[in-house]
């Protein structure tokens, strides 16, 4: 029984082509308008479970900041620095409204669903990724996740106020059992994912496998990190971009 967990799906287009490669798929999206689009797109897939909740460290209610570009919406209010920086591209990170959404503890939810192993864990929840992953400690410690593809923020950055999503936190949480393979930006496609072009001591490093990002000079403080369970075969996750 192969399982995909998809946290922060938005309209679900990032992974739609992968759903039929898994026996069960769990999709989480708090924005009610985006959730309605998910229902229309995936209602015919009986193996796909759609959940209209934000993944968090607790079950209940929380404020949710809806941005002009819905992909930037978050449980955290975008920081002034992030909003101003984003304006150089467009005004998509500007908050247009604040709503109340349901929240769940993801680790508890998946245990209640009797999920025994997650083949691919995909998380893009705008600053809450580390907080959510901490609820999965039982899965992590017992090596019950094969591959992880997670939005990550650079150390020292605060993109969403009050949310710590720094790379060093992921490294500490996953370090013993999981290997950091590479970081990517872009969209899902054929071939291996491309790493961010980074500078270390002024030199451009373009190798796909980068083991240490502590000295990265990354203009964009957001990227997506790919982690694999030690000894687990390379799978779909290694080809993903976001």
Feature names for model-found ranges:
Residues 1-242:
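Phosphate/nucleotide-binding beta-alpha loop and adjacent structural elements of enzyme active sites
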């Amino acid at each position: 029984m192969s399982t995909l967990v998809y946290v922060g799906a938005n309209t679900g287009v990032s992974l739609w082509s992968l759903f039929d490669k898994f026996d069960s798929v769990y999709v989480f999206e708090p924005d009610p308008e985006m959730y309605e689009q998910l229902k229309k797109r995936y209602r015919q897939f009986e193996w796909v479970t759609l959940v209209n909740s934000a993944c968090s460290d607790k079950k209940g209610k929380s404020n949710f900041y809806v941005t002009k570009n819905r992909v930037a919406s978050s449980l955290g209010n975008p920081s002034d620095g992030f909003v101003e920086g984003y304006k150089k591209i467009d005004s998509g990170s500007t908050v247009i409204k604040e709503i109340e959404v349901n929240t769940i503890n993801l680790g508890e939810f998946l245990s209640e669903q009797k999920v025994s192993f997650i083949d691919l864990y995909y998380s893009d929840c705008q600053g809450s990724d580390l907080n959510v992953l901490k609820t999965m400690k039982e899965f992590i410690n017992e090596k019950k996740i094969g591959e992880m593809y997670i939005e990550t923020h650079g150390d020292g950055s605060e993109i969403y106020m009050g949310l710590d999503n720094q790379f060093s936190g992921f490294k500490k949480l996953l370090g013993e059992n999981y290997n950091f393979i590479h970081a990517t930006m872009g969209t899902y496609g054929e071939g291996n994912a491309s790493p961010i072009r980074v500078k270390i001591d002024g030199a451009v490093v373009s190798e796909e496998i980068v083991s240490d990002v502590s000295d990265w000079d990354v203009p964009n403080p957001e990227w997506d990190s790919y982690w694999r369970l030690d000894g687990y075969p390379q799978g779909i996750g290694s080809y993903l971009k976001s």
